[in-house]
Amino acid sequence: MIASVTGEVAFVGATLAVVEVSGFGIEVHASPRTLSGLRVGATTRLHTAYIARKDEAPLLFGFAQGDEKEIFTVMLGVSGVGPRTALAAVSVLGPEDARRAIAAGDDKAFTAVPGIGPKSARRIVLELADKLVLPEPPVQQANQPQVPVWRDQVVDALTGLGWSEKDAVRGIEDALQTQPELGDSGNVAEILRAVLSWLGTSKGTTHAPTGRR
């Protein structure tokens, strides 16, 4: 089985491309989505699926992403869905929308694919319900502190004025201990003024700006 091909693109057509590998020109059928990203003379790597069916010439189908290949191969297991129709589904919907439609039982989404009518769309959703699922969202670490979006802006402003990053961070923490509502507001200008005021009045805890005399 040919799982992938890597080589120089020799030709890009409306429905296929030719990739030169070790002196051989390999014809790869692909969706417009994949073909649009290929350039003649450039090196590419395509995930491939080799399809050989009775009474039909074997064909090699290529995909820019492994997820596209997975959608294609799984759809071939649905009764009445051939490689051309499966390829069209990958092109029209894309992997994420195809998974989302199946998870939601949205058979109408598949009727937008050429060659798939209402009956076939319902069959696709039913047969793939337990085969194509949406990926689990990333799990956030428990008790992981969230850095406010304004923090980096205030630190950059303070270091630009000559304060060290260490003193800038300490100044923010100490200033907000006395005025915690500023952190909730997220007002960069007000937070910066408060930190500068704290840095200017604190004694023995911070250094003067390194870039100023």
UniProtKB/Swiss-Prot annotation:
InterPro entries: DNA_helicase_Holl-junc_RuvA_I (IPR013849), Hlx-hairpin-Hlx_DNA-bd_motif (IPR003583), NA-bd_OB-fold (IPR012340), RuvA (IPR000085), RuvA_2-like (IPR010994), RuvA_C (IPR011114), RuvA_C_sf (IPR036267). It is found in: Cytoplasm. The keyword Isomerase does not apply. Residues 152-213 are annotated as: Domain III. It holds the Pfam family HHH_5. Keywords: Cytoplasm, DNA damage, DNA recombination, DNA repair, DNA-binding. Residues 1-64 are annotated as: Domain I. One of its GO terms (molecular function) is ATP binding. SUPFAM superfamilies: DNA helicase RuvA subunit, C-terminal domain (SSF46929), Nucleic acid-binding proteins (SSF50249), RuvA domain 2-like (SSF47781). GO terms for biological process: DNA recombination; DNA repair. Residues 65-143 are annotated as: Domain II. GO terms for cellular component: cytoplasm; Holliday junction helicase complex; Holliday junction resolvase complex. Residues 144-152 are annotated as: Flexible linker. Has three domains with a flexible linker between the domains II and III and assumes an 'L' shape. Domain III is highly mobile and contacts RuvB. HAMAP family: DNA_HJ_migration_RuvA. Homotetramer. Forms an RuvA(8)-RuvB(12)-Holliday junction (HJ) complex. HJ DNA is sandwiched between 2 RuvA tetramers; dsDNA enters through RuvA and exits via RuvB. An RuvB hexamer assembles on each DNA strand where it exits the tetramer. Each RuvB hexamer is contacted by two RuvA subunits (via domain III) on 2 adjacent RuvB subunits; this complex drives branch migration. In the full resolvosome a probable DNA-RuvA(4)-RuvB(12)-RuvC(2) complex forms which resolves the HJ. Belongs to the RuvA family. The RuvA-RuvB-RuvC complex processes Holliday junction (HJ) DNA during genetic recombination and DNA repair, while the RuvA-RuvB complex plays an important role in the rescue of blocked DNA replication forks via replication fork reversal (RFR). RuvA specifically binds to HJ cruciform DNA, conferring on it an open structure. The RuvB hexamer acts as an ATP-dependent pump, pulling dsDNA into and through the RuvAB complex. HJ branch migration allows RuvC to scan DNA until it finds its consensus sequence, where it cleaves and resolves the cruciform DNA. This is Holliday junction branch migration complex subunit RuvA. It comes from Kocuria rhizophila (strain ATCC 9341 / DSM 348 / NBRC 103217 / DC2201). The lineage of its organism: Bacteria, Bacillati, Actinomycetota, Actinomycetes, Micrococcales.
